[in-house]
Regions:
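Membrane-embedded helix-loop-helix hairpins and adjacent transmembrane boundary segments
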Residues: 1-460
């Protein structure tokens, strides 16, 4: 009953905020890019909240607890850097395609290629589905553990909440709720860290846990540090650095923010985001330093807080977790909805189709999240590598390098058909070197094949 009440209160809060600060939108410009009027402060909070997905709330604690300093480093630093590196490219796409809505639309216009539009639509659409599945998987596990209700019912509840307000005004609803959600996350995280420090001996316990619960992960350059680099750090860095480039959520915000505020918005968003893995990672270090034994390391923050702090602390903790998960889910819904404009054009009918697209995405994501044995970390690493498949062709296009539509299509297709399976095999077989090779192959093959195929097309 406790968990159900929390969900109901949260749903009412998000719907109330949406109704209070936005109006129901029927035009594509307003629904997909918020009339291109978003200011820097609100945009920064929205960017940070959108980037706060399940891994930043759960995996940061897990990495601190199981892999110490190397794990936290390879999770946090690329997460922050990727948003900063994205800034010049966000500015470029806005300058080159000022009335745009999607990355797919930009690439299709540059190359006048249906194949390029198709492969980019697939990559961006698949990413939105898999990213949503991660959020539902992580959130559903937590809520099922607390409420005792079936996991599948919790994934349905989370999906219903996100859809209830996202369908009302599209990106406007996503952004205004992002502001509230980020506030909940930051205040909740600060509360958990302060209370946990008081109950475990303070920063001495944090220092004791820097080497993880095993005490073996104290350095980036040690044998265990190199092991983390190959098995986790390199695939994570590749996936994260390419993150915004292969995610329509961030291109959509680049088109929605006031043109002169893009740079400062993404920079501030990166700094705001950094506070979250730092807070949750501290909880992981405290758990390790205090000798806490987690039954599920992927849920170590929840288990540790539940065992250490008063029951009432679960209320802000749950609000924080739900906010982090749904801030990404609603952004994914808006991103997938915006892709309809590439195929149907802009009009009132497009908005109705966009709302139906949101529902379709949720149905597929719920099905994936309910696959037995699926873990947050595996799914996150997989779709992180998927994002990398379009990184180099996108960057080279924005930098005005000489590519052709056939070259771009061949490059992305090669990355998807060669690099991604290699990574998937390494991930399933638990072979760090193969995972790293798969990540690098995905990134590099798309660019190299695009260049080679483009030159051949020009010569022909």
């Amino acid at each position: 009953m406790f968990g159900i009440v929390i969900l109901a209160v949260y749903a009412v809060l998000m719907i109330g905020v949406t109704l209070m600060f936005t109006r129901k939108t029927t035009d594509a410009e307003g629904f997909h890019v918020a009339d291109r009027r978003i200011g820097s402060a609100i945009a920064a909070m929205s960017i940070a909240a959108t980037w706060i997905w399940a891994p930043s709330l759960f995996t940061s604690s897990e990495m601190a607890y199981t892999r110490g300093i190397p794990g936290m480093f390879w999770f946090t630093v690329p997460n922050v850097l990727c948003l900063i590196l994205f800034i010049p490219f966000a500015k470029r796409i806005r300058a080159q395609y000022p009335e745009g809505i999607t990355l797919t639309g930009y690439m299709a216009e540059r190359y006048h290629s249906g194949k390029v539009k198709g492969v980019y639509s697939f990559q961006l659409g698949a990413l939105a589905v898999l990213s949503t599945a991660v959020q539902l998987l992580a959130g559903g596990k937590t809520l099922a553990l607390i409420t005792g209700l079936p996991f599948w019912s919790m994934t349905l509840a989370l999906a219903a909440i996100a859809y209830s307000y996202s369908r009302f005004s599209g990106l406007k609803a996503s952004i205004i709720t992002d502001v509230v959600q980020l506030g909940i996350i930051l205040m909740g995280g600060a509360l958990l860290v302060v209370l946990s420090l008081r109950m475990t001996g303070g920063f001495d316990t944090v220092r004791a846990g820097l080497g993880a619960v095993s005490g073996e992960y104290t350095s980036l350059t040690s044998s265990t540090g190199i092991e983390v680099l190959l098995g986790y750090g390199l695939p994570m860095a590749v996936g994260l650095i390419s993150g915004p480039f292969g995610d329509q959520c961030f291109w959509q915000r680049a088109f929605a923010i006031r043109r002169d505020r893009i740079g400062r918005s993404f920079f501030a968003g990166a700094l705001l985001f950094a506070l979250v893995p730092i807070c949750m990672g501290t909880v992981g270090f405290l758990a390790a330093g205090s000798g806490f034994v987690a039954s599920d390391t992927g849920m170590v923050n929840f288990e540790f807080v539940s065992s250490l702090l008063p029951t009432w602390v679960l209320v802000p903790f749950l609000f924080m977790i739900i906010s982090g998960l749904l801030s990404t889910v609603d952004s994914n819904l808006c991103a997938a909805a915006s892709l309809t404009t590439d195929w149907l054009g802009i009009g009132k009918d497009t908005v109705q189709t966009s709302r139906r697209t949101m529902l379709c995405l949720l149905i597929v994501a719920i099905a994936i999240a309910n696959i037995p044995g699926l873990t947050v970390t595996y799914l996150f690493l997989f779709y992180g590598t998927l994002r990398a498949s379009t990184l180099l062709p996108t960057v080279m296009t924005l930098l005005s390098k000489k590519l052709t539509g056939k070259g771009v299509f061949a490059g992305v297709l090669t990355a998807l058909c060669v690099g991604l399976p290699i990574f998937a095999y390494g991930n399933l077989a638990g072979i760090p070197a193969v995972k790293a090779a798969g990540s690098l192959t995905t990134v590099l093959s798309s660019g190299l094949v695009a260049i080679i195929a483009s030159r051949k097309a020009v010569k022909a």
